[in-house]
Amino acid sequence: MGKIGIFFGTDSGNAEAIAEKISKAIGNAEVVDVAKASKEQFNSFTKVILVAPTAGAGDLQTDWEDFLGTLEASDFATKTIGLVGLGDQDTYSETFAEGIFHIYEKAKAGKVVGQTPTDGYHFEASKAVEGGKFVGLVIDEDNQDDLTDERISKWVEQVKGSFA
């Protein structure tokens, strides 16, 4: 398995902590802060995991917004991509974890893996749901932090084969 690039953007530190947990669980990965990343660095990986918190009511975190603006759909075309979104399903029930939706819109030009069921979450709506599943792993550190490690473990097992 080639090295996986795990790219994250964060304001509170939660997305970085999740990226580190995923790196530890999956092994052979490099964790990269998008605030310091370059397009060339991104394009040096064929396998990436993109970890993005949701800002406010469904917006993409600022560092991700800036970095995503430097990338084209073609930058994703030859990649295998896992998406991980963070959100607060209680406070932002109608836009839960929509930060990853904005990335998914470009990432779907490549091979997106790791869709997960919405079971166990309580929210009204989310653009991050397609075909009844989240477009990636969704973490709620505000309300369900006790489930984070188990969700990461299950998701890593699910996607490992796709990253082989």
Swiss-Prot record:
<dbReference type="InterPro" id="IPR010086">
    <property type="entry name" value="Flavodoxin_lc"/>
</dbReference>
<keyword id="KW-0285">Flavoprotein</keyword>
<dbReference type="InterPro" id="IPR050619">
    <property type="entry name" value="Flavodoxin"/>
</dbReference>
<dbReference type="InterPro" id="IPR029039">
    <property type="entry name" value="Flavoprotein-like_sf"/>
</dbReference>
<dbReference type="InterPro" id="IPR008254">
    <property type="entry name" value="Flavodoxin/NO_synth"/>
</dbReference>
<feature type="domain" description="Flavodoxin-like">
    <location>
        <begin position="4"/>
        <end position="160"/>
    </location>
</feature>
<comment type="function">
    <text>Low-potential electron donor to a number of redox enzymes.</text>
</comment>
<keyword id="KW-0288">FMN</keyword>
<protein>
    <recommendedName>
        <fullName>Flavodoxin</fullName>
    </recommendedName>
</protein>
<dbReference type="GO" id="GO:0010181">
    <property type="term" value="F:FMN binding"/>
</dbReference>
<keyword id="KW-0813">Transport</keyword>
<comment type="similarity">
    <text>Belongs to the flavodoxin family.</text>
</comment>
<keyword id="KW-0249">Electron transport</keyword>
<dbReference type="Pfam" id="PF00258">
    <property type="entry name" value="Flavodoxin_1"/>
</dbReference>
